[in-house]
A protein has these predicted regions:
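Generic structural signal for hydrophobic
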Residues: 43-47, 74, 103-107, 132-133, ...
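Glycine-rich phosphate-binding active-site loops on the catalytic face of alpha/beta enzymes
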Residues: 56, 111-118, 166-181, 228-245, ...
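C-terminal alpha-helical cap/extension of soluble enzyme domains
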Residues: 4-16, 197-268
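Active-site mouth loops of central-metabolism enzymes
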Residues: 24-38, 57-61, 82-96, 142-156
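Hydrophobic faces of well-ordered beta-strands that scaffold small-molecule active sites
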Residues: 25-31, 51-56, 81-85, 112-114, ...
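Conserved N-terminal beta1-alpha1 strand-loop-helix module at the mouth
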Residues: 1-73
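Catalytic cores of alpha/beta
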Residues: 42, 96-102, 152-166, 213-227
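Active-site-adjacent beta->alpha loops and helix N-cap segments on the catalytic face
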Residues: 38, 61-74, 90-99, 116-137, ...
Length: 268
């Protein structure tokens, strides 16, 4: 029996088997709004085994004087740091995308997000930025609109997702923002199933990270696709909560604890 600080590891339940890190499915991607190293250490102390990608949100990396200490912590816990897409968008708009990417590489980021929700950018220009970034990073390409009340029809999402992957993105990320009320969701935070199914049918569930900041949204995706669905924009305080949802240790998803119910029926 393995003990951690005097407490034995719990191993008495039959639960879905989760792959160990580094994994390619069942990813938990968290959104860091600008916490310091001490807060990051608290999250990692409890949940590093359940955290795969740590997005340093928006442009916070540019002004965070403790960024180096935080990125070192992430590396020590085998969590990949991701540069938020807004910073790269602004750099691109100023003609400084190469400088931004060079800085991100030197800082220690392993992932970068490529988005087009802040500045005007055509799909052709986005593909070019993805190709540029993919030379040195794993690219998360965001699809969908950030604008409240603006809903792209379901038929438009697969076209951008396929284009982004063809340009070299490792994964596509469906827009949901920190609020969970845009993009893949309506203004009340309800999932738009037609959008989800259109994207998954086009590129497969394993190549999509679904931004899902709300517990009800996370539970919906796990019930639909099983515990190995990739979830993004998870709050730092919700890392363990999401893992319990994956394992069926919350009433919202208790059925996934039965192996015959965990696989889902989605395209691979």
């Amino acid at each position: 029996m393995i003990y951690h600080r005097g407490v034995p590891d719990a191993s008495f339940l039959d639960l879905p088997q989760r792959p160990a890190k580094p994994r390619t499915t069942g990813l938990t991607h968290v959104l860091d709004p600008g916490v310091g190293p001490a807060a990051a250490a608290d999250v990692l102390g409890a949940g590093a085994a359940h955290t795969d990608i740590w997005k340093v949100g928006w442009g916070t990396a540019y002004v965070d004087r403790a960024l180096g200490a935080k990125l070192a912590l992430l590396a020590d816990h085998a969590v990949s740091a991701c540069l938020g897409g807004t910073l790269l968008e602004i750099a691109w708009a100023q003609g400084r995308a190469r400088e931004c990417l060079a800085w991100a590489g030197e800082a220690g980021f392993g992932h970068v997000e490529v988005s087009r929700g802040t500045v005007e950018m055509t799909l052709r220009e986005k593909r070019g930025l993805i190709r540029l970034a993919a030379a040195d990073f794993a690219v998360l390409a965001e699809v969908g609109s950030k604008a409240p009340g603006e809903q792209f029809a379901a038929r438009h999402w697969p076209l951008e997702a396929i284009s982004d992957l063809d340009a070299g993105a490792s994964l596509v990320v469906t827009e949901g923002r920190q609020s969970g009320t845009v993009g893949t969701f309506d203004a009340a935070g309800r999932v738009r199933p037609d959008v989800v199914e259109a994207v998954v049918t086009a590129v497969g569930r394993k190549r999509v990270v679904f931004e899902a900041p709300q517990t009800s949204q996370q539970a919906w995706f796990i019930r639909r696709f099983g515990p190995e669905v990739n979830l993004g924009n998870v709050a730092l305080s919700d890392v363990l909560s999401v893992e319990t949802l994956r394992l069926g240790l919350r009433s919202d998803t208790a059925a996934v604890a039965r192996p015959e119910d965990a696989a889902g029926s989605e395209p691979a």
